[in-house]
Amino acid sequence: MFFSISFSDKPLINLNKEMAMTVELLDFPEIDGDFLRVEGKELEKKEKLLIQYRIHSIEEKKKLEQSILPFMTCRLSGKLKSPPLPRNENAFNYQRYLKGKDIEYIFELGTWDVNQCKKLRNNWNSILLHFRRYGIHKIEETFEKNVQPLMSALIFGEKSQIDESINEAYQKLGIAHLIAISGLHVGIITGLLYYVLLRIGLTKEVVSNFILLFLPMYAILAGASPSVNRAVLMTGIIVLSQKFHRQISSIDAISISFLITILYNPYLIYHAGFQLSYAVSFSLILSSSVILRQKKFFKQLFLGSFVAQISSLPFILYHFFEFSLISLFVNLLFIPLFSFIIIPLSFICYISLLIVPLLSPILIFLLSTCIHYSNELIMCISKWDPFIFVLGRPSITILFIYVVCFLSLFLQLEKTMKNLTYFTFSLMFPIFLHFASTVVNPYGEVVFIDVGQGDSILIRLPFFQGTYLIDTGGSLSFLKEEWKTRKNEWNVGGDIVIPLLKSKGIRTIDKLILTHGDHDHIGAAKQIMQSFNVKELMVSETLDKKDGEKDIIRYAEINSIDIVKAYRGLSWEVGKHQFRILHPKKGASSSNNSSIVIHALVGGKKWLFTGDIEKDGEEEINELYHHLNVDILKVAHHGSNTSTTETFLKKIRPKISIISVGTNNRYGHPSESVLEELKSNDIEIFRTDLHGAIKYQFFLNTGTLYTCLPYDS
């Protein structure tokens, strides 16, 4: 494996320079709104690439949908880029994800001339991919909208059509494995094939040969995800061993498949689906004798679900930071429903649609009814917040303790199921330790979250004495033509702030402080209040409020969240940590200059959080506070030249400045004049556009500044 890793790095190619290359496309393009992506292979150096293209018109979109086919060769021009590193702590690592697909670079195109593409002769891969696409389109044409996405996922492994809210509900309840093709699906299909082919009179030898031929074809049809490949490879090894009259155990089969996969691509070890697939399958195989020892089906189901839940828990917490307390019981309900009704009925419906169309309407009605009510029930259960427990990402030490405790639990399970005390301790001890590690934490932190062009600052005091969020960031949404709209639009709250807070084990926010009403500061506030227990909402004491602010305040009132109007002179203390509102005065008009300005003593440093305050506000603070020393300044208004004057800087004398600003933003922030002013005053500059999230972690009165991206002064 180490040998494989050492030779997996590709030679570096000139990046960010316009170049032309001939590329073979490896699949159908994925077109979402006005965005196209497709995997390809550069023919000269055999380099696998992810090709991305922004479509310019609806006519071009239709032309690309009709013209671009797998295994075409195209002459394309664009810029080669490295996949982005995560810009926030515990964020999804897209670069590592692409390496798991053996992709080192992204090729961004400026234009795509379909006349520069030509179709080579069909191969088996191409034929299977065409059949897969035909099947997905057939489902889209025939079935109702609530049935299409799930059927495509269950038959062809195409999950991109599933609504984000439904996908999240399955994930929250720990039943996402039911809509990902895995050993369950491969087992059902292989078992049915084996039975049918034997019944029609074929010999075992012929059936084995057919299954060995069918399995790799099915892997391509099913999307070739890590869980599909694991199940197909493992089944193939077992069938092959039987063919040569050499009995191989399931544990040997899964071990061989693991080694083959890792030797082929070591980076797959980081893939969440790969980890979950192997961890759960391995645990179920090891526990199979105990599970099958139970005579009643319900006991077997309960024990199997229990083993699957326990073995997947460390990985679920590492990647998704939370789990459902009722996941085991939800699995007991939905595993039989999917195994015996929904999955078989999906395949029967699809096959009948191709062979006996007259039977289809009755079967489709039955399937639609099952899927509709199961989705409704899943959505309903997932909204019961008391059952969703946020623990955060476990440290390596905590992960190790999880593994040791759960392995000892499985070993005890092999001997006896009567030692309830041992089971309870082995199960609860790592969970309790994980919970305690977030609550009884002597370290505090101030995190400037990278939310693009906006502000969001997390202050977490030691031992969870206080958790404050100053602003939330917000995605500005512009009216788009319908053809440009994507299925699941990106948003700051759901994609950045909420996952980050959950990854730190945060369940409660003591103060949600909204400095002023601009969307790039408050746009995700409602999502935050829906996702966490917010005790207090602090807003600026202004006479006029924007519609967005009014909407947030109304939501807080309806949900019994305390609302505090911030004004000059308001202060609070938690231990040695002090917070004081310097601005605005009561009855200020609603503008950038009415931003809440907070002077804080946290972690032995004096901080000034300025919102979007401008020159007039800075002058007012200068006049009122003559001895306002600051160690770390949050530069106002993303470094705009309307703020951060020389007079203000000389008055407060910060040593470090932090600018929260979006990469290549349309406003040209930060201003060159502001940067020069900071440099001329010997103030060190940190920027979220260059450094990603910026974190000050402290213990007692000393701390260290960290950046998420490599820091280059």
Short names for language-model regions:
Residues 1-10, 14, 200, 286-447, ...:
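Transmembrane helix-bundle segments that form internal channels/tunnels in multi-pass membrane proteins
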Residues 2-177, 495-502, 508, 542-544, ...:
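Membrane-interface helix/helix-cap signal primarily in integral membrane proteins
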Residues 102-234, 239, 511-513, 536-539, ...:
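Aromatic-rich juxtamembrane segments at the membrane interface
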Residues 164-328, 391-441, 541-543, 646, ...:
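Hydrophobic alpha-helical transmembrane segments in multi-pass membrane proteins
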Residues 180-181, 255, 271, 469-472, ...:
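Active-site neighborhood of phospho(di)ester-bond hydrolases with catalytic His/Asp-centered motifs
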Residues 267-269, 382, 389-396, 400-403, ...:
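Core dinuclear metal-dependent hydrolase active-site scaffold
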Residues 519-557, 654:
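Active-site HxH/HxHxD metal-binding segment of metal-dependent hydrolases
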